[in-house]
Every structure is written in C-alpha cells, then in structure tokens.
Amino acid sequence: MRKTHFSIVLFLLLFSFSQAQNNNTKGIPPAIAEKDLTAYLFVYFTGNSVEEEAVRYAISADGYHYYHLNNNKPVIDSKVISSTGGVRDPHILRGDDGKTFYMVLTDMTSSKGWDSNRAMVLLKSTDLVNWKSSIVNIQTAFPGNENLKRVWAPQTIYDAKAGKYLIYFSLQYAGGPDKIYYAYANKDFTGLESAPKLLFVPKSERACIDGDIIEKDGIYHLFYKTETENPGIKVATTTDLTSGKWTENDNYLQQTKDGVEGSSVFKLNNSDDYILMYDVYTKGRYQFTKSKDLENFTVIDNDISMDFNPRHGTILPITRSELKKLITKWGMPDKFPKINNNPVLEGYYADPEILYSNKTKKYYIYPTSDGFDGWSGNYFKTFSSDNLTDWKDEGIIVDLRKDVTWANRNAWAPCIVEKKIKGKYNYFYYFTAAQKIGVASSDNPNGPFTDSGKALVSTRPEGVKGGQEIDPDVFTDPKTGKSYLYWGNGYMAVAELNANMISIKEGSTKIIKVDDTFREGTYVIYRKGTYYFLWSEDDTRSPNYKVRYGTSKSPLGPIEIPKDNIVIQGIPDQGIYATGHNSVLQIPNKDEWYITYHRFSYPTGIKMGDAGGFHREVCMDKLEFNPDGSIKQVIPTHSGIDAIK
C-alpha cells in the first residue's frame, strides 16, 4: 500500500490518526467526487402547446454538445404528474447525499393563460428514470392566498445551515408584481413545511422571475430576470439564503439585445469555468456564456451544438453510471462519443483485488476505501459485475470499528480466495488493519464476513529489521492445491496456510529475495508452468509508482527478473500517473487476462501533492503475454476494456 521507511510512516500514521480522532469530519470522501462527474443531463421543455409542455432529456459528454434522448419525446407523462396537464421550467438538483435527485416544475399549460396556475410539481428519484411526484397547490394548501394569480419557475437548493431543501419560486398576487418567495420542503419532498416567505425583491420593486441560485466560495449568487423598462438578467448575492440581505449588481448579464428569460448556471466538470445559459425566447434559441467569477461572461455560442430546440431548462452534471442508466432506458444517440470505462469504480478506491466467484458466476472487486486523509479509512467494501465494466456497490463487508476487535484503523489492501471445502464454497478475506494482517471468512463473496478474532500476522518475520506487515496476497497453487500468503512492505514474505485458511503452518514463513525495485503489493499468478510474481515500485504518492514482475518455477521462489520487467506505468501526456498495486484476473477456462490497478484520480490527482496518494481510483486494462511467456507491458488507458459476455 505505501512505500516509505517504517519509522517515518509510523509517525505520519499516528499523527494522521490523532488528527482524525480530533476531527472526524476531516478528510472524509465526498458523496460524489467531482472527478466522477463525466457527463451532463439537460432537462427541458420545448414550447407552448400542451404536447410541448413536458419534461424532456438530453445528454452531453463535454457540456458543449447535446443530444436528445427518447427521440425528443417526453420522459415523464405531464398528465400523470400535474393538475393542469402540462409542466414547464424543469429544474433538477442532486441531493446532498449525492444519490437522490429532486426536480421541480411549473404546473401549467399556457393555453389556459399566463395567470392560470397556482401549483408546482415536486419529484424525487434515485436513478433519474423513475420519479415519485407530488402536486403542491399554494392557494389551496395555505390560507390567505385567495388573490394568488400564478406560481412560476420553482427551483431547489440545499440549505446546509438549515439542513433542508429550500424551494424558491416567483409568485404574483392581484395588483402586484412577481416576487421571489421560498419555503422549505418537507422531509419526504412531497410538500412545503410552511406558507411561502419572501426571499428576494429587487430595489426597483419591479417584477422579477426565473430565479436561479448557485453557491460559490460561500456566496450565493441569485440570477434572475428583472421586468423593468429594460428587462434582462441580473444577479444578487448573499452569504445567508434567508436573511433578506442581498447585494444587487446593476449590470445586465445577457449578451444579446433579444428578449431572454429562464437563466441557469452550472459548473463545468473538473474545471473552474461556469456556464450561464438562458432562453432567448423571442428567437427560439438558447445562448451559452462562460465565466470564472460569475460576474464577467463571454459568449460561446459557436462552441455549442444541440439537436433539439429547448425552452427554459437546467443542466445537471452526472456520473458515468448515471449516464449509462439513461442510455439503457432511452438509447444511445447516434453521434454520442464512446463512453470510457476507466476508472471501473466511481469514488476513491485503491489496492484492488479481483475475483471470479464460481458460486455466483460474477466478478468482484475488493478495494481499499480511499479518500481519507493519511489513509485513515476503517472499512472495506466490495463491488460485483457480470461484465467487468458495470459494477454494483455491494456495501460494506468488514467494518473495523464494528467487526474487528484487534484493530480499528487503517483498513488497507485486502485480498480474497475462494475455496471449495466439503462441497461448499468458502471465501477467506485477508486484510490489513493497523499495520497487521487479519482474516475473515464467509459463505458468500459479498459477505457477511466474520473475523477470526485475532491478527494472522502482527510482527516482522525473523531477520527483517524494517518495513510494515501490510499488503497480503493469497495464492493457491494449481499444481499442489496448497495456499500461500504473501505480504510485506520493504520485504516480500511468504508462508503456507493451513487447511483451515485462517492460520499459518508453523515454520513455513520465509523471505523471498527481490531486487531494489520491490516496495510492496505482491501478487502471484500461474500460467503455463510459470509462476509470475508482480510487485509495486516506489511510493504510492509518487507519480512514478509502477508495477514490475519476475518469474519462478515455484510459488516460493527464487525469482528470476527479466531485463525489461515493467508491467504497467503511467503516461504523463495522458494525465495517467501512479499506476500500481495490482491484481490479475484470468477469465475462467480461457487464456484471457486482465489487470486491475489504481492510479492517481484523473484529472486532478497529480495536482494534489501527497494527497494524490490517498485519492486514487481503480482501473482495468488487458494483460497480454508474448510468445516466450514474458509479459507485454500494459499501456494504461482511459477507455478501459469492453464489456465481456
């Protein structure tokens, strides 16, 4: 897992652990890592006829080129979710938990008049495909709204201070201008907690509609359309959403003389740039502008393409798995670019172990849970797949704080083996905890796992003066059926496991000599009479972290090291760094092999300094052999592998 001298590592670990204990919110992985936001969903409606007043979807790989889904037909039936038979102005938000989505809509058909609606629609989803909806009629739900004329363009933002979702919208009462109001949604997102309250009224006290709020650096920016003699888009800012204290910017932000409305702002993925777009409704088109400061905007219309004509909508950054769900449901647009399959897991993970289960006929990845400051994670997860490209999070399988009595920190570098004992499949899961190695067992590859109750390896082998007892690898020799445990940072140790797989055969521990490139992460495979020993060189925080190999005629060595023995290393020109700590998968009954490994998270890991070494992601590429049995150097890719059948 890590590659530094033991004394330095121990100091850093203890310091990191102490800091984490003092502040358990520090260095916790986000619900959604920005590096996993790789595409965009555009939610919109198309016009003023009843058929056009419905939610439609489009997708983009880069935020500039958009392709409609479902043949540009509605993805939600307006008649089912609304009181008027039509909906407009869709706004979509990713929830604070990262996995729940909230959409709000104007409940209105324009054919009945611009003052005909009193309601909005609230929707909630966990997959962007299936939505639960509720109608909120302001006039009937809250007394005192008899003079309410219309409810327009609702939107949602998470108010971290209140811990609630704030819905804001414009209301117009008889004899008065449109003003922007707000109310908090109830816990189920099916209604409002209270009657609407004023959120914002411009100094001009003239009408304002189509509010859109985005937070940047602790400041909330409210973009809105003002209905003065010179209508257009302006912005006001505050540090407290509901304080009523807004600072207005008098400048107009639209970059056209044509009439505009329905502004919306989103941040480009893995970028400092923001896009402000708005509906040029008098010309039937959209305009896109770009900014870094949310004050100065440049038109980028020449960079934008769409194969549809949207009206007022919003754009949501989405992950690859979310994109795939949309495509599975509504099809892949003909011109949409090929989707990369690396990294194979979303989120921060490292030290991947991969297994094919003969019991379930599925593939499993067992990684280190990464993204914690100083490698301070304390639980392990597993992920399953039928095709090696689409992975399901199976949840936590070992939590050191709950499931292990002998250690509660630094959950690192697991490995697993499937053994058939007395006709039943058993799974033995070896893991590092607090620089010791333990083992847990289960009847299923996704658990639950039961810890053995004590560390399997807790001290250095005899004669070893430095390093750490980490990075276990388990290998069953197909020639003898014996199973071996390998481990070590700074040294490579091996011991034969007893038949129970949870204890080491007495007197079997030995040190295998490797060259100076060995640091950690031993992995052993067998192919056509040859044992291949793979290991990682350098420090996991180093951009030069890589995998090398040697061969042997025995699982106990000695190891012969080829002249050109790099298995995989980074490609700086492609932003790929620190490709290491691997495992290898052989497709059952085939001479077909794949290597899983971690790398710095792309594209920002290389900019993180040492933190890049605990913000890693898991990738997979094909592993091939030359005719003489030597390993071809793997070229790491962003595209990854194609799904297997």
For the regions a protein language model found, what residue spans apply to each?
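Bacterial Sec-dependent N-terminal signal peptides
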Residues: 1-26
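Carbohydrate-active catalytic/glycan-binding domains of CAZyme proteins
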Residues: 22-645
